[in-house]
Amino acid sequence: MRFRVKLILLGCVAGLNASPAVAQPDCPHGALDTRYCDRDGDMVADAPTDAKQFIDPDTLIFSYTPIEDPAVYASVWENFITRLEILTGKKVKFFQVQSNAAQFEALRSGRLHVTSTNTGGVPVAVNCTGFVPFAMMSSPDTPYASHTEIIVTNQSEIRAVQDLRGRTIAFTSPTSNSGYKTPIYLLEKDFGLKVDVDYKSTFSGKHDNSILGVVNGDYEAAAVADVVLAPMAARKVFDPAQIRSIYRSGSFPTTGYGYAHNLAPALVAKIRQAFLTYQIAADANLSPEFPAQTKFIPISYKQDWQVVRQVDAATGVKYDCK
């Protein structure tokens, strides 16, 4: 059960200015690409030691992880963006990123400054792009957690996980934790079902594509994140009575929010302040999308993403940062 995720950088994203990092040969890298140093052992890229390598752009580029049509989230994040502009004193532009590949490319080349990345994409972004995750959403009592669900249509003959043998399961993308890596790992570990041996696989590109593909009868079954499934149902994108969940995994950390490692320290401090003092529950745009979440809390990639890295290791994931 091994596969390789290759990050290939294809060129520029229109309207964004690049400022790529250069190789850092004389420092500890850990699992990071050689462009980045990890002297303190926290598993994320250190800030540059040369002040000339810091960037302090007049306009900050912000994006949200591409789990659905990015246009949906432009208005969702509008109030937060205003808050970010006030605290940083900079104009903030929402970048409608279409894919993880485009997001990682923009991060690595310096054209994206503040963003969120889906659970499974965080290790890719950390190791290959210099992404520094520092926050995630939380309810008053517990951090926002993600689960993998395997869904089928309500009329499907598939009633239990073992019924997936010989069927085709739609996954989202190879970098997705809840949409690919975790389900293929757990299906083999707990049920003896090996991907592309005991069942066939296909990729939809995004969680919303997988969900709507099941609803519309295009896919027999799909592995998706509940943190995408529930908001889509709440927005009445589909009727939840049309589907059934036949499996739900244990919890994983969810979307990680962070910044490019080479942003100026004073700017980083203001970005962190904007997130960690923001009241999600008071935001009329953001709170309906994340109704149980009230705030952002600090995270540690080294500690909080350990379980995700363990799944990657167990499934033989290797990342080629090119």
PLM features: residue spans?
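Acidic, polar ligand-binding/catalytic clefts
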Residues: 104-163
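Bilobed "Venus flytrap"/periplasmic-binding protein-like clamshell domains
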Residues: 62-85, 120, 143-211, 227, ...
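Periplasmic-binding protein-like
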Residues: 65-66, 140-149, 176-178, 237-311
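Short beta-strand-to-loop elements that line the ligand-binding cleft
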Residues: 91-98, 194-206, 244-247
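N-terminal hydrophobic or amphipathic helices and topogenic motifs
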Residues: 21-102, 285-322
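A ligand-binding cleft/hinge motif common to bilobed small-molecule-binding domains
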Residues: 119-130, 183, 188-189, 213-216, ...
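Short helices/loops that flank or line small-molecule/ion binding pockets
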Residues: 101-115, 128-129, 162, 207-227
